[in-house]
Structure formats: structure tokens, C-alpha cells
Amino acid sequence: MLPRNATDKIQGNVSKPCFWKSLSPGQNWKSKSMRSFPEEFVKSTPGAFEHRVVFSVRWGNSWQLWLEREEKDLFMIEEDWDEFVDDNHLGPNDNVFFRHDDKMFLEVQIFKNDGNEIIDAPPEVEPETEPFHPTTPKNSHKETTTASASASASEFSDNWRETHGCADIKNPELYLLNPKNPYFVKTLTKGNDVLYVPKTVIKKYGLKFGPHLSPMHYLLPGDKINGSTKIYGGGSAPCFNGWVDLCRKYNLKTGDSMVCELERSGELVTAVRVHFINKT
């Protein structure tokens, strides 16, 4: 556990609601008590955490965790929390700091007992590919649609998957509308609802984003999906929400790949043009 003066120093620079998690004797990171939110934290963020929460870390990864209530206590779903623990290799010498950022979003920092912060992804974690979880967990909140709308969406997505593939993309620059635009290849893995721009791409093209919550768009053939820009990690981890809506609409699955072409207005990135790759 970090010394009290170290936690006070870190927490003293934070104006938003926050809390710490570290192990007590007899606990492990997958103990049920580690999945709960402090009561004071929940009270200080009324309405922010109804059905799910999104954790973001400094190296660009994020995790969506569904929530459940037991009487007055709020817990993260066991499967989702365990995935976060495993992905970050949390151990007995780790201290995790959670800070409320906006609505259901939390910024997460991991510190060792010596006070050093973990700022790089574990070897097994790919910081430039955020995961997408296409299924809804048991007992989680479910959005409702009319029968006709549901059938129409299902027919549309099934037809799309018949004509598009997700094999490794060679020569992605050939798919760009403007060869001078920044781009990257996105492959879906497991568990998130925002689109991160790889830090290597940001650095290569000198990209700028924002301001926080400013509108942006996903551009597809004959379609436009609205989203917004999110800025985390002091500006070092920009991302776009609305990505989960695109994934659901086009029935995207784990392993699907596409080319993401970034459109700029002035100096700022304001749109992502998504190129699906036809089967050969």
C-alpha cells in the first residue's frame, strides 16, 4: 500500500471525485469487495453510473464494465472486472487510483508501492487497439427497439457481412479517399465502445483534437453517424465515442478490420471515414 503522504499528494491535485483501491490482508484483486464502489464516491456523482462504467488508462486502452446493484451497494460485473485485473496484471504491490472524468467515464492510474506510476501497457496489451464487446451481459441494461426496426437492422447487418470481409489489410493507403489524409487500420478485439487514435499516428501527423465533447462524425458510403471527441490523460489519449453504435449497426465482430481515414477541419480532426474491405 502506498504511504498516506503519497496518496494525499496525488489526490490533492484532483478536483473531481476519486477513490483508491489496494489490497488488504486476505484479499486478492478478484475478491468481491474489490468490485464495489465506495458509497461516498457514488453519492458524489449522482446519476453517472446507472448501467455501465468505462475505465481509461494513460497508454490509451479502455474497458467497459457493466454494473449491478445489491441493495444499496454498486458492483462491477465479475467477468468485466476480472478482465480488467487480468489485462493489467494487478498484483499485491499495486495501488489503483480512480478519478471521475465525465458521466460514466473514469480515468485510472496504477501505482506501485514505491510510488512509481505504470505508464506503459503490459506486453500482452495492445494500446492502440481498443476492444469491442458485441454482447450484452446477463442482468445488464438493454435498449429496446420495435420489432420492425430490429428486423430491418438485422437484415441490413447480415447482408453487409455477406459482402465484406475482415482479413489482414494489405496496402491500406489504396483505400483512402485522399491519399494525404492520416489513417490507421483498426481490428476489433474485445470489450469497449470508443475509438482511440494510435499514438504513433498522432505523432507522425502532428494531429490535434478537441475541445472535449466537441462533435465529430463517422463517414461511410451513404451514411453518417454522429459522435463526439473525448480527451483523456491530459490530452495524450484522445478518442471518439459513438463507435459502439457503428459497430452494432454494421454487425461488426471481434477480428473484423477496417481502414480509418481521418478528416480534418483546419488543424483539428473532426471526422473518421471508415473503409470496409470487400471479400476477395
Curated annotation (Swiss-Prot):
Residue intervals passing through the bilayer: none
Localization terms from the record: Nucleus
Span list, region Disordered: 122-153
UniProt cross-references to Gene3D superfamilies, sorted A to Z: DNA-binding pseudobarrel domain
The entry's DNA-binding region: 20-114, 183-276
Annotated Gene Ontology cellular component terms: nucleus
UniProt entry keywords in alphabetical sequence: DNA-binding, Nucleus, Repeat, Transcription, Transcription regulation
Major location category of this protein: nucleus
A Pfam family that the UniProt record links to this protein: B3
Keyword rRNA-binding: no
Lineage top rank: taxon: Eukaryota
Any GO molecular function: DNA binding
Protein name, UniProt field: B3 domain-containing protein At5g25470
Taxonomic source organism: Arabidopsis thaliana
